[in-house]
Curated annotation (Swiss-Prot):
Name assigned to this protein: Dihydroxy-acid dehydratase
Family: Belongs to the IlvD/Edd family.
Broad enzyme group: lyase
Required co-factors: [2Fe-2S] cluster; Mg(2+)
Organism (species): Methanococcus maripaludis (strain C5 / ATCC BAA-1333)
Amino acid sequence: MISDNVKKGVIRSPNRALLKACGYSDEDMEKPFIGVVNSFTEVVPGHIHLKTLSDAVKHGVYANGGTPFEFNTIGICDGIAMGHEGMKYSLPSREIIADAVESMARAHGFDGLVLIPTCDKIVPGMIMGALRLNIPFIVVTGGPMLPGEFQGKKCELISLFEGVGEYQVGKITEEELKSIEECACPGAGSCAGLYTANSMACLTEALGLSLPMCATIHAVDAQKVRIAKKTGSKIVDLVKEDVKPTDILTKEAFENAILVDLALGGSTNTTLHIPAIANEIENKFITLDDFDRLSDEVPHIASIKPGGEHYMIDLHNAGGIPAVLKVLKEKIRNTKTVDGRSTLEIAESVKYVNYDVIRKVEAPVHETAGLRVLKGNLAPNGCVVKIGAVDPKMHKHEGPAKVYNSEDEAIAAILGGKIVEGDVVVIRHEGPSGGPGMREMLSPTSAICGMGLDDSVALITDGRFSGGSRGPCIGHVSPEAAAGGLIAAIENGDIIKIDMIEKEINVDLDESVIKERLSKLEEFEPKIKKGYLSRYSRLVSSADEGAVLK
């Protein structure tokens, strides 16, 4: 066992003494050491309940002959960080979390890990760190939040972001907005739709890294405690059997996750996180081109918020990810999972699917997959749109650019009534390096939706979008403005042509004009000169490469 390097032999007497100071016995030190990686915090609703889950995991570890050691990582709530400088730290926190997991596990000689994340960057961050070690691990995601209810209608966090736009144009009163605020988020869990946190939980299960149904069991459901306990027991088996993550995370496993993502219409942020996770196995193991290629294999089969009518509770009751695998059985690759059964064995074990929620492939919500990769002179390395949450009339759009050099400039213009039907809002200098941190543009997109412009106005950015964004929102434009991408040279009034069906995005300019404008661009000057974001800005790769640190 790896932990023998910490605890075995006369030379390790000082090490054992320190462990005994923590309350561990000689008997405990004979067992496999299991790190229980928690991300409990009192400021993030997706994480406020994780102490209960970590206790359940530890019970499972003890019951099956292991010794658990709990430690914590940071966890940022994108919703609380949204719309201000704090959002610049969200994506970069993924790398801190990965480094923390790697450092703690290696320093203390853990034989296996159970990861307990919930929200957006914590899920991929923990997995990335654990993959660097290539020791057995299982993920217990914290689970979705239940939707709230206002005046007989379900609501959740995005109802409020869009409510701000509705208030600005007089659709609702401030009192009504306040009333929605009181009931939209009723308790623990990740936001109630198929936003980034829940998308990543679903893909983690599809990768084979969580036990079946884990992704969709809700935070307040006792089933979540039971599956946490079962996971604690299972990790001891994986350590004894030496089942490494690289035995599970083959190219085909990643393809399964991407197929599930495309079929469900998950968050565009998955196109950052899946390549970043795969990068820990091999550079460019998975790229945007894989999303593009696989998007032709499956249709969009689930109508889940923000692009549809259902919530995560509906997906769970419809059969969860195993039911999605069953529906996609003809496309799914047969891969290993931490459960011990193969992906197809899990799919074949499903006895019930609600086909009103998870549609059959031959009767989909949309014929096209839920995510689309676009390329053209504006984004030669690619950009991403959640086409499953776009009004079909906006699948093709041509309009004049309204250009803003930050999210703050753009939101002021949108709320100030400066955007009209037909416009293409361009927000630049918000990329991984230029932002820095690639802020999510949920406030601008929600304002556009709330004001009723989402069927006539497109938004393009080198930043990214919340999983809760809907409408014609095209993000991750690569190269970004800070890297000299064409988005840096667009001017007000330039005509931008978008064709989501043909996967194209271009600005209507002669090549000679493009070259002249690019030649006049000033050299990028980092906005932040000290601290973590200064280092991040210098070291981060492009969005099309997963925004990983070089």
